[in-house]
UniProtKB/Swiss-Prot annotation:
This is Cobalt transport protein CbiM. InterPro entries: CbiM, CbiM/NikMN. It is a multi-pass membrane protein. Residues 1-30 form the signal peptide. Part of the energy-coupling factor (ECF) transporter complex CbiMNOQ involved in cobalt import. The complex confers cobalt uptake upon expression in E.coli; can also transport nickel with a very low affinity. It comes from Salmonella typhimurium (strain LT2 / SGSC1412 / ATCC 700720). The gene is cbiM. Keywords: Cell inner membrane, Cell membrane, Cobalamin biosynthesis, Cobalt, Cobalt transport, Ion transport, Membrane, Signal, Transmembrane, Transmembrane helix, Transport. GO terms for molecular function: cobalt ion transmembrane transporter activity. Forms an energy-coupling factor (ECF) transporter complex composed of an ATP-binding protein (A component, CbiO), a transmembrane protein (T component, CbiQ) and 2 possible substrate-capture proteins (S components, CbiM and CbiN) of unknown stoichimetry. Expression of just CbiMN in E.coli confers some cobalt uptake.
Length: 245
């Protein structure tokens, strides 16, 4: 009972922060890739790639909840963490902007499959309530932030643990590289959709990556440090085990 109360308190804190982001006036920069920015063929292609990931995520989510119903509150906490961090925007490139992703914690606790669902829910609410991203571009944003970024973070986490690195170092690398991988994919998405007239898609991807890096590298480092702090608090309060879930 005490454990569930702690989780509910943490989740309510995340919800309060999310509501604050909704009521505080914000400048109208689009979060992620904004609605209507991608050509229809690319928007559809990314949606077709994202749908099987959603199906797999639902299977994983159902299995986790069936095995331990108390995980629902921890899942809500991870979802709130993703929502709050990914709603902090730093304008970077026309049609998109830099921000933390917040997926590292959920990746460590539940694996990348569940993050596809959490990320999709977050992106949907941000598109509908905050005008961040969009419905037509949700497939592209979901593939970058909720699928490929988390998969990279998960692989880094597993390799770091097998290499015997300190737990805090492994958490930091997972969160930071999941963030950077997200923006690498976003750069590719924008680059192939809008190739450079002279250098082609490759040149366009490099340009997008170069501009994103100016803000995203320090943001990713900060996200890694914050995730370490949150993970450390969850373990100290015995909300999770040291090994994660």
């Amino acid at each position: 009972m005490k454990l569930e109360q702690q989780l509910r308190q943490l989740s309510f804190s995340g919800l309060a922060a999310a509501l604050l982001l909704m009521v505080v006036p914000q400048q109208a920069f689009a979060m992620h890739i904004m609605e209507g920015f991608l050509p229809p063929v690319w928007a559809l292609a990314w949606w077709l790639l994202f749908l099987p990931c959603l199906w797999y995520g639902l299977v994983r989510l159902r299995r986790i909840v069936q095995e331990d119903n108390h995980q629902k509150v921890l899942l809500a906490l991870c979802g709130a963490f993703i929502f709050v961090l990914s709603a902090l925007k730093i304008p970077s490139v026309t049609g998109s902007c830099s921000h933390p992703t917040g997926v590292g914690l959920a990746v460590i606790l539940f694996g990348p499959g569940v993050v596809a669902i959490l990320g999709a829910v977050v992106l949907l609410f941000q598109a509908l309530l905050l005008a961040h991203g969009g419905l037509t571009t949700l497939g592209a944003n979901g593939m970058s932030m909720a699928v490929i970024g988390p998969v990279v973070g998960y692989l880094v986490w597993k390799m770091a643990c097998r290499a015997g690195l300190r737990r805090d170092v492994a958490v930091f690398l997972c969160a930071m590289l999941a963030d950077l991988a997200t923006y690498f994919v976003t750069s590719v998405q924008l680059g192939v959709a809008f190739p450079d007239p002279h250098a082609g898609a490759t040149g366009s991807v490099v340009k997008f990556m170069g501009i994103f890096c100016l803000t995203q590298i320090p943001v990713a480092i900060a996200e890694g440090l914050l995730t370490v702090m949150i993970y450390d608090q969850l373990t100290k309060r015995q909300v999770i085990t040291v090994q994660g879930h």
